[in-house]
């Protein structure tokens, strides 16, 4: 009997209960990297913030896990969870929009494609919005727009820096013009936040496309992207068919956008919290002055640095 036949016979005679037990034990224990194909122990992968330990591929992150990665423990205060989407257009494709919403809410446990709230990051207060691609591709509908607008307005009222983690396929087609209106709505709120001299940092993750890219994702004071994230407006195939030209390889990646000045920095996920904390700290109304030591650096007693406002007034 060949080795192949031996394994085939064993599989046929093996008790189904044992096969089921083995599948149950293995389920969720290991995660295969979609980029390099290496199997990783799921607990180790989570400890590395869902970044492949072998090739550095950044797997998609659920909003709850992203909040856990960024916000200090026991400081998260969620906002506007009671707001839920409706179906004013009675939209229907293969199934009604109302049915799609209900099914997605049951599957993900989310009310819509963004979670918003306040908290601290390394002790520094901030307002944070986290998009979740699991909810209809992270598409931007009226609830996403309303929650991000309210978050931005609260950040303005409370003089908080604002960070939005972007992950979206764009505007939600089932809401038509109501979805497209959110682009201007959020942009207006962000403009008032900017006029208050407050910091806004969008973090572009894979993917960030469509109406999100055309609005709040590109309006930051400092724009950060994760490595090898897909960032763009329309898809490559659509652009090539419209322009009738071949586009350069990788032109919608974060690396390409960094090279051409559309993003300010590419930050690996494992360094994101520390980077955000440093940027927020530097943009506080005051920050500590480091005294020289041996003509280099010395972490001495903090000193308040006087800053000049746009009107020429000096503040401390």
Swiss-Prot record:
InterPro entries: AcCoA_carboxyl_beta (IPR034733), Acetyl_CoA_COase_Trfase_b_su (IPR000438), ClpP/crotonase-like_dom_sf (IPR029045), COA_CT_N (IPR011762), Znf-ACC (IPR041010). Keywords: ATP-binding, Cytoplasm, Fatty acid biosynthesis, Fatty acid metabolism, Lipid biosynthesis, Lipid metabolism, Metal-binding, Nucleotide-binding, Transferase, Zinc, Zinc-finger. GO terms for cellular component: acetyl-CoA carboxylase complex. Its cofactor is Zn(2+). One of its GO terms (molecular function) is carboxyl- or carbamoyltransferase activity. Gene3D superfamilies: 2-enoyl-CoA Hydratase, Chain A, domain 1. GO terms for biological process: fatty acid biosynthetic process; malonyl-CoA biosynthetic process. Pathway: Lipid metabolism; malonyl-CoA biosynthesis; malonyl-CoA from acetyl-CoA: step 1/1. Zn(2+) binds at residues 33, 36, 52, 55. Residues 29-298 form the CoA carboxyltransferase N-terminal domain. Its main location: cytoplasm. SUPFAM superfamilies: ClpP/crotonase (SSF52096). Binds 1 zinc ion per subunit. Its EC number is 2.1.3.15. It is found in: Cytoplasm. It is an enzyme of class 2 (transferase). It catalyses: N(6)-carboxybiotinyl-L-lysyl-[protein] + acetyl-CoA = N(6)-biotinyl-L-lysyl-[protein] + malonyl-CoA. A zinc finger (C4-type) spans 33-55. Component of the acetyl coenzyme A carboxylase (ACC) complex. Biotin carboxylase (BC) catalyzes the carboxylation of biotin on its carrier protein (BCCP) and then the CO(2) group is transferred by the transcarboxylase to acetyl-CoA to form malonyl-CoA. HAMAP family: AcetylCoA_CT_beta. Acetyl-CoA carboxylase is a heterohexamer composed of biotin carboxyl carrier protein (AccB), biotin carboxylase (AccC) and two subunits each of ACCase subunit alpha (AccA) and ACCase subunit beta (AccD). Belongs to the AccD/PCCB family. This is Acetyl-coenzyme A carboxylase carboxyl transferase subunit beta. It comes from Microcystis aeruginosa (strain NIES-843 / IAM M-2473). The gene is accD.
């Amino acid at each position: 009997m060949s080795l192949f036949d031996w394994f085939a016979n064993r599989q046929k005679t093996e008790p189904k209960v044992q096969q089921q037990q083995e599948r149950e034990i293995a389920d969720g224990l290991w995660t295969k990297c979609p980029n390099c194909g290496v199997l990783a122990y799921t607990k180790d992968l989570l400890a590395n913030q869902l970044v492949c330990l072998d090739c550095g591929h950044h797997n998609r992150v659920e909003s709850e896990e992203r909040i856990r990665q960024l916000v200090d423990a026991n400081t998260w205060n969620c906002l506007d969870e009671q707001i839920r989407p409706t179906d004013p257009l009675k939209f229907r494709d293969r199934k009604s929009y109302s049915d799609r919403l209900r099914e997605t809410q049951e599957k993900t446990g989310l009310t819509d494609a963004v979670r918003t709230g306040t908290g601290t990051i390394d002790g520094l207060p901030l307002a944070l919005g986290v998009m979740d691609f699991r909810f209809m591709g992270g598409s931007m509908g009226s609830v996403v727009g309303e929650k991000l607008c309210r978050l931005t307005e609260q950040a303005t009222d409370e003089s908080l820096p604002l960070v939005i983690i972007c992950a979206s396929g764009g505007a939600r087609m089932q809401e038509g013009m109501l979805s497209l209106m959110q682009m201007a709505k959020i942009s207006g709120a962000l403009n008032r936040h900017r006029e208050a001299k407050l910091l806004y940092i969008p973090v572009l993750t894979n993917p960030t496309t469509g109406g999100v890219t055309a609005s709040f994702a590109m309006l930051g004071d400092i724009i950060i992207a994760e490595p090898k994230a897909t960032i763009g407006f329309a898809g490559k195939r659509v652009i090539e068919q419209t322009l009738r030209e071949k586009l350069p390889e990788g032109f919608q990646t974060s690396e390409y956008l960094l090279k051409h000045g559309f993003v300010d920095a590419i930050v690996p996920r494992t360094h994101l919290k520390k980077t955000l904390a440093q940027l927020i700290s530097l943009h506080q109304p005051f920050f500590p002055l480091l005294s020289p030591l041996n003509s280099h650096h010395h972490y001495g007693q903090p000193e308040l640095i006087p800053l000049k406002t746009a009107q020429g007034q000096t503040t401390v």
